[in-house]
Amino acid sequence: PSMLPESVLLRAAAEMLDYEGSGQSVMEMSHRSKVYDAIIKGAESLLREVMEIPDNYKVLFLQGGASSQFAMVPLNLMTKNRKADYVLSGQFSTKAYKEAARFGDCKVVASSKEQNFSRIPDLDPKEFRPDADYFHICMNNTIYGTVFHALPETGDVPLVADISSCILSRPIDVSRFGVLYAGAQKNVCLLYTSPSPRD
């Protein structure tokens, strides 16, 4: 998890008792109120601007951390052929795979587990299933210090990525993905990487 700038913490503290003159905290207001509606619409607008999210993509703010998506993704996407392909590059992609395997036919198309997840595994497109409902990766692995520098070419199969550790740390071409998800508890961070043979 990254540190929030002091200015952000001070503003949040100041608005804890009275959000912009509303007489209440954000934690107290109804999610149906005009004040809260303006907050969520403003947050979505800023996220769309910063990430250059195309208009044909929806932005969802959901309860729970990114780990809840380990079940939500297969429950919502693994519906046609009940198949999904997973790249195991660390702890979180492995957890995502194990959870998804409870709901359908999940295939590990590449893994660097034998190398203690010290690198992103080599991908062989011949292992990718053209009838998979989606293809899942975890773009950045903070525990192991690895990151995808190039995205897999999945053809007509939607690419799904956990970007919890790298959201807003570098530009991402959102249009390359079917779904991107991230947990807010990691905050928005700066990510420093250097070229390495491990990548």
Regions found by a protein language model. Name each.
Residues 1-30:
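N-terminal "arm"/small-domain region of PLP-dependent enzymes with the aminotransferase-like
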Residues 14-21, 45, 49-53, 102-105, ...:
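Generic secondary-structure signature for well-ordered alpha-helical cores
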Residues 21-69, 76, 90-91, 98-99:
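Conserved N-terminal alpha-helix of the aminotransferase class I/II PLP-enzyme fold
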Residues 57-59, 82-85, 156-158:
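Short active-site oxyanion
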Residues 67-135:
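PLP-dependent aminotransferase-like
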Residues 100, 112-167, 179:
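Active-site phosphate-binding strand-loop segment of PLP-dependent enzymes
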Residues 160, 174-186:
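Conserved active-site segment immediately N-terminal to the catalytic lysine
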Residues 192-199:
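Conserved small/polar residues in nucleotide/adenosyl-binding loops
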